[in-house]
């Protein structure tokens, strides 16, 4: 499938635990292009006292990677985003533009600790939504409080949260229980986005083609296109609805 949008990738070099060099970023982009990806959301971590690269450095690396992407192949592009580690101050940080939203839109890629309580997740989702943000729960299959409790995922979705899972999890790279959980999310129409969560060319390599093939086989082409292309395309289309400035992304 061509035209895939990778909504979760640590492709900016030297700003977190993802790509470490510009050459590695280039190789990641080349691989993504070969696997049908045409847009990548660069999502460097932001976590207090752990991942706090300056926005100046992030912007510089983003511009370099975006320029490389343009030379990879027709239609290849990169948009700036961030993977926020959720804490009590996330709304304040977003309002203060400490880090960008996803492609300058109102969507926010939100990561929780694996052992976060469900009540904490629900409260933070409510805080974000009531302040005009649209939280995307990053790699939702990892959170212990959700486990195979699909009704909790449904409750978060009813609040207005969106769910992202990793491509590798869908095809069983994290075990059969996680694979089954992801499959049920698809069957219950609770999955909204898929990302590679790519971190480099040796660790968490940004593969997605096999996932796309699996999804087509199990759920059909129309569903796969909706999750991998159409849903993330809506983020780009609505970026001018974002809160404040567009944080370095392109606008029409």
Predicted segments with their positions:
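Non-catalytic positions within long, well-ordered alpha-helices that form the structural scaffold/packing
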Residues: 33, 129, 186-187
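Extended substrate/RNA-proximal surfaces in nucleic-acid metabolism proteins
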Residues: 52-164, 242-243, 248-251
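Active-site environment of divalent metal-dependent phosphoester hydrolases
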Residues: 46-50, 85-87, 142-146, 170-173, ...
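Mid-to-C-terminal alpha-helical segments outside catalytic/metal-binding sites
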Residues: 208, 212-252
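Active-site neighborhood of phospho(di)ester-bond hydrolases with catalytic His/Asp-centered motifs
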Residues: 5-7, 41-43, 79-82, 136-138, ...
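Short acidic/histidine-rich active-site segments
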Residues: 190-206
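An N-terminally biased module of ancient metal coordination in phosphate/nucleic-acid-related enzymes
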Residues: 1-75
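Active-site mouth loops of central-metabolism enzymes
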Residues: 11-22, 108-116, 170
């Amino acid at each position: 499938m061509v035209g895939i949008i990778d909504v979760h990738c640590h492709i900016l070099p030297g700003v977190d635990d993802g790509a470490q060099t510009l050459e590695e970023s280039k190789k990641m982009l080349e691989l993504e292009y070969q696997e049908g990806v045409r847009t990548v959301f660069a999502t460097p971590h932001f976590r207090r006292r752990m991942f706090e690269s300056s926005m100046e450095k992030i912007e510089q690396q983003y511009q370099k990677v975006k320029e490389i992407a343009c030379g990879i192949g027709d239609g290849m592009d990169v948009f700036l985003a961030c993977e926020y580690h959720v804490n009590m101050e996330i709304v304040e940080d977003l309002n203060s533009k400490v880090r960008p939203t996803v492609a300058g839109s109102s969507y926010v890629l939100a990561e929780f600790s694996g052992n976060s309580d469900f009540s904490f997740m629900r409260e933070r989702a409510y805080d974000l939504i009531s302040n005009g943000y649209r939280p995307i729960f990053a790699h939702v299959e990892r959170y212990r409080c959700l486990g195979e409790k699909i009704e909790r995922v449904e409750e978060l979705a009813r609040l207005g949260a969106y769910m992202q899972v990793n491509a590798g999890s869908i095809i069983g790279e994290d075990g059969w229980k996680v694979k089954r959980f992801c499959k049920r999310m698809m069957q219950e129409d609770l999955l909204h986005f898929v990302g590679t969560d790519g971190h480099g060319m040796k660790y968490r390599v940004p593969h997605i083609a096999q996932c796309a093939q699996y999804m087509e086989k199990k759920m059909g082409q129309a569903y796969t296109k909706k999750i991998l292309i159409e849903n993330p395309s809506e983020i780009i289309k609505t970026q001018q609805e974002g809160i404040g400035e567009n944080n370095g992304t392109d606008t029409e």
